Each structure stands twice: as C-alpha cells, then as structure tokens.
Amino acid sequence: MLNMKEQYTKEVVPALQKEFGYKNVMQVPRIEKITLNMGVGEAVGDKKLIENAVADLERLAGQKVVVTKARKSVAGFKIREGWPIGCKVTLRGERMWDFFDRLVHIAVPRIRDFRGLNPKSFDGRGNYSMGVREQIIFPEIEYDKVDKIRGLDITITTTAGTDDEGRELLKAFGFPFKK
C-alpha cells in the first residue's frame, strides 16, 4: 500500500489533472497543512486539565503544542485575559502526511455511529473543517489513561481555489463523505 504522499503524486495528481483539465502539475490542489485545535474552556477552574489536553494533542501530533490564551476577559465565561483556554498545533510536511493517513484509515472508521463526513463543511476556498467528539478514536490515545473525553477541531488547509476542487482532492484520498 502506498503512503499518502506517494498516493498523491502517483494517483491523485493525474486523476485531478484529467478531471479539471490542469495543464501544469503545480496547478493541482494539494494539502498545505493540517491544524488541530482543542478548546478546554473548563481549564479555568483546573490547570491540570490544560496539561492533560496538551499531552493528548502532543501524542496525536508528534510535536510540541502551543497553548492558546484568552484574548480578552469575559465575565460570563469567568475568564481573564491571558488565561490558558486551549491548545493547538499545525502539522506540515511528513508529520502532516502521517497524521492524514491515520485520520483517514484508522481514526475516522472508529467514530461511533459513523455514516460519513459532511461534504458541506468546506469554507468556500477549498479548506475542510471537521470536529471530533472523542479524542479516543485515535490509536495513540490510551483509553485507560484519559482523564476526560474531549473533542478537537481538525482543519485541512488546501491550495484548492474552490470547494469542488477541495472536495475532489479529499475524495481522491478516500475521504469518506456522506452520499
């Protein structure tokens, strides 16, 4: 079986060139980066929660995670400016391809009651965003060691100009969209 990067050059590029009539290989849309974000709003009361979220995300990504801080104080949410309220990581290059491979072939099929991903979750510029309700669908996260089940946001940024191009790019990789 080909890894995702090889699959892109050997199968996806020729298929998209044929479908959209690109003359140059560099016109073909490609995945630029994958961003993982975990909002931990309940970390306001307990600093240990943010540490556990960071550890989970680092295990998933295989690289250091950035802790996101509140931009301004909001009394309704009981947060102050500068308090840690989440964490994020941006994957590029080899780590991005490895994560994308695990996402498509291992994690997505493990989602409970899975009937396909929403094909309308594109932003108008060919980038796809999805939410995962449980981080335990990934094999790196051990179920026994999880203190709390958290969700995370996954954004796949592509060089595609339109949603149709982005959708076809992800479909060519075997992304399971709803019919």
Curated annotation (Swiss-Prot):
The lineage of its organism: Bacteria, Pseudomonadati, Pseudomonadota, Gammaproteobacteria, Pseudomonadales. One of its GO terms (biological process) is translation. Pfam families: Ribosomal_L5, Ribosomal_L5_C. It comes from Marinobacter nauticus (strain ATCC 700491 / DSM 11845 / VT8) (Marinobacter aquaeolei). This is Large ribosomal subunit protein uL5. Keywords: Ribonucleoprotein, Ribosomal protein, RNA-binding, rRNA-binding, tRNA-binding. It comes from the Bacteria. One of its GO terms (cellular component) is ribonucleoprotein complex. GO terms for molecular function: rRNA binding; structural constituent of ribosome; tRNA binding. Belongs to the universal ribosomal protein uL5 family. InterPro entries: Ribosomal_uL5 (IPR002132), Ribosomal_uL5_bac-type (IPR020930), Ribosomal_uL5_C (IPR031309), Ribosomal_uL5_CS (IPR020929), Ribosomal_uL5_dom_sf (IPR022803), Ribosomal_uL5_N (IPR031310). This is one of the proteins that bind and probably mediate the attachment of the 5S RNA into the large ribosomal subunit, where it forms part of the central protuberance. In the 70S ribosome it contacts protein S13 of the 30S subunit (bridge B1b), connecting the 2 subunits; this bridge is implicated in subunit movement. Contacts the P site tRNA; the 5S rRNA and some of its associated proteins might help stabilize positioning of ribosome-bound tRNAs. The keyword Zinc does not apply. Part of the 50S ribosomal subunit; part of the 5S rRNA/L5/L18/L25 subcomplex. Contacts the 5S rRNA and the P site tRNA. Forms a bridge to the 30S subunit in the 70S ribosome.
